[in-house]
Swiss-Prot record:
One of its GO terms (molecular function) is rRNA (pseudouridine-N3-)-methyltransferase activity. It comes from Prochlorococcus marinus (strain MIT 9303). It is found in: Cytoplasm. InterPro entries: Alpha/beta_knot_MTases (IPR029028), RlmH-like (IPR003742), tRNA_m1G_MTases_N (IPR029026). HAMAP family: 23SrRNA_methyltr_H (MF_00658). Its main location: cytoplasm. This is Ribosomal RNA large subunit methyltransferase H. Specifically methylates the pseudouridine at position 1915 (m3Psi1915) in 23S rRNA.
Length: 150
């Protein structure tokens, strides 16, 4: 199962808005090189219902939608890696809302919501944190030395 997961490791981030800060762009570029299966799709800022429509329109039928929300499930890095492994070769599409978050309808229509923090984060920073955690999860599952936590 582990080898299948690593071989088919493909994630997508659907994010509202653009990244404007150079240091975040640099960090994203670095992790995207390390995660060749990662795709990032940006949707325009709009009202929550319109953003939800754009997010759902961008979603492929074979993708599992995982919204990021402060109300979502908080996981350790190791627990996150194990959760990703359970999805096997299914493609996960993580969704990061804009300044107003995500519509309740979108969040409630999914099986799993993920929380990066109980605090509200700027969407640009949430994107960088998520990409780093996806990379960390991959190295945990591969037995790499990047993750040094317990």
């Amino acid at each position: 199962m582990l080898q299948l997961f690593l071989r088919n490791c493909a994630f997508r981030i659907i994010a509202v808005g653009k990244v404007r800060k150079g240091w975040i762009q640099d960090g994203l570029a670095m992790y995207q090189k390390r995660l060749p299966g990662l795709m990032i799709t940006e949707v325009r800022d709009a009202s929550l219902p319109r953003e939800a429509e754009a997010i759902l329109a961008a979603l492929n039928s074979n993708e599992v939608l995982v919204p990021l929300s402060e109300e979502g499930e908080a996981l350790t890095s190791v627990s996150f890696a194990k959760r990703l492994e359970k999805y096997g070769s299914q493609r996960l599409a993580f969704v990061i809302g804009g300044a107003d978050g995500l519509s309740a309808e979108l969040k409630n229509s999914t099986q799993w919501q993920l929380s990066l923090s109980a605090m509200t984060l700027p969407h640009e920073l949430a994107r960088l944190l998520l990409v780093e955690q996806l990379y960390r999860a991959q190295t945990i599952l591969q037995g790499g030395k990047y993750h040094r936590g317990s």
